[in-house]
């Protein structure tokens, strides 16, 4: 049986890490696409030359033409400029919006049946623009944010409690930015909710609040440490979890930037919520109950995303007609 084809649009740090992970997991054959000549070809050849050592048979190629996307079952989009120190995700808006228009047109022409995962920041606005530009069904276009933010939250909690990351579950909803909403009441260690762990004396509410703040600033913390770029290992691993759930019909419940059409009281927007990803794409939106401060924080986050989308509409009004 022929292997699935996975197209990586953008061959920077995340793109290269994605290609390597796909090879190691043998999720499919990889085509790396980038407008920079030589970069996708060089990276794919380098990774391919590691295959005899690591023992995988997935094929990797590089290309500078959108035609190379033809037949891809999954497209993962990282194209655009990365965030630099002192730069907010919002600063990236006008530059990366133009990139999403071009990428959307390329996917529409050559891989209209693909499952599309967007990683480009500012995420919630870019995945919205990508769906509009491509005209693809909303259930087949998602943004990678919540899996990454939740993974950071889980890591910090596991470190705090000195337990395995495998026994920590956590949900981070809302926009992928400073207004994201780490949900304490839906986060657990071995099924025990965080509020109960506070009562048990494992930690304090003040310490949980510090971890929530660190999660919100997780991306900026890495940007400030690296000084020349942004995170790429954890974002790539997060996107792979989403792609694998689609390709293997695993139906995992993952927090993703998904298109909402009335769910959570939100319409015509992409916002981070729990979804089931299977062979049909986003098969279900898990509309968990939000109340009190959680609802207030979620609504504030939605407002921040709406501001970005409104800015997109002003910059590229033609997107609304697509």
From Swiss-Prot:
Specify the species: Nitrobacter hamburgensis (strain DSM 10229 / NCIMB 13809 / X14)
What is this enzyme's EC? Answer: 1.1.1.37
What name does the UniProt record give this protein? Malate dehydrogenase
One GO BP annotation is: tricarboxylic acid cycle
Q: What does this protein do?
A: Catalyzes the reversible oxidation of malate to oxaloacetate.
**Sequence positions that bind substrate:** 83, 89, 121, 152
Q: Which positions, given as ranges, span the membrane?
A: none
Catalytic class of the enzyme: oxidoreductase
Which superkingdom? Bacteria
Intrachain S-S bonds: none
Give the record's keywords alphabetically: NAD, Oxidoreductase, Tricarboxylic acid cycle
Catalyzed reaction equations: (S)-malate + NAD(+) = oxaloacetate + NADH + H(+)
Q: Which family does it belong to?
A: Belongs to the LDH/MDH superfamily. MDH type 3 family.
Tell me which residues this entry annotates as catalytic: 176 (proton acceptor)
The record's listing under Gene3D superfamilies reads: Lactate dehydrogenase/glycoside hydrolase, family 4, C-terminal, NAD(P)-binding Rossmann-like Domain
- Family annotation (CDD domains): LDH-like_MDH
Binding-site list for NAD(+): 10-15, 34, 96, 119-121
Task: Specify whether Oxidoreductase is a keyword of the entry.
Answer: yes
What InterPro entries does this protein map onto? L-lactate/malate_DH (IPR001557), Lactate/malate_DH_C (IPR022383), Lactate/malate_DH_N (IPR001236), Lactate_DH/Glyco_Ohase_4_C (IPR015955), Malate_DH_type3 (IPR011275), NAD(P)-bd_dom_sf (IPR036291)
Has the keyword Oxidoreductase been applied to this entry? yes
| Gene for this chain | mdh
Q: What GO MF terms are annotated?
A: L-lactate dehydrogenase activity; L-malate dehydrogenase (NAD+) activity
């Amino acid at each position: 049986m022929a292997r699935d084809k996975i197209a990586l649009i953008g061959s920077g740090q995340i793109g290269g890490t994605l290609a390597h992970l796909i090879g190691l997991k043998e999720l499919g054959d990889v085509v790396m696409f980038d407008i920079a000549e030589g970069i996708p070809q060089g990276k794919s050849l380098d990774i391919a030359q590691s295959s005899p050592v690591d023992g995988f048979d997935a094929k990797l190629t590089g290309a500078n033409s959108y035609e190379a996307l033809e037949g891809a079952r999954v497209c993962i989009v990282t194209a655009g400029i990365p965030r630099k120190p002192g730069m907010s995700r919002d600063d990236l808006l006008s530059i990366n919006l133009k990139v999403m228009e071009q990428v959307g047109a390329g996917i529409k022409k050559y891989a209209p049946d693909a499952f599309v995962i967007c990683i480009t920041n500012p995420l919630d606005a870019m995945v919205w623009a990508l769906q509009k530009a491509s005209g693809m069904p909303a259930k087949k276009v998602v943004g990678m944010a919540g899996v990454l933010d939740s993974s950071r939250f889980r890591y910090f909690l596991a470190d705090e409690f000195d337990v395995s990351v495998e026994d920590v579950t956590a949900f981070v909803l809302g926009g992928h930015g400073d207004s994201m909403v780490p949900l304490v009441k839906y986060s657990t260690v071995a099924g025990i909710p965080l509020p109960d762990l506070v009562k048990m004396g494992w930690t304090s509410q003040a310490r949980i609040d510090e971890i929530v703040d660190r999660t919100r600033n997780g991306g900026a913390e890495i940007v400030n440490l690296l000084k020349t770029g942004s995170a790429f290992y954890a974002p790539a691993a997060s996107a792979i979890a989403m792609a694998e759930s689609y390709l293997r019909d695993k139906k995992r419940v993952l927090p993703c930037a998904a298109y909402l059409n009335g769910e959570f009281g939100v319409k015509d927007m992409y916002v981070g919520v729990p979804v089931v990803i299977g062979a049909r794409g986003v098969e279900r939106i898990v509309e968990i109950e939000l109340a009190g401060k959680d609802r207030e924080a979620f609504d504030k986050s939605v407002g921040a995303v709406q501001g970005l989308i409104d800015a997109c509409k002003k910059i590229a009004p033609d997107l609304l007609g697509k």
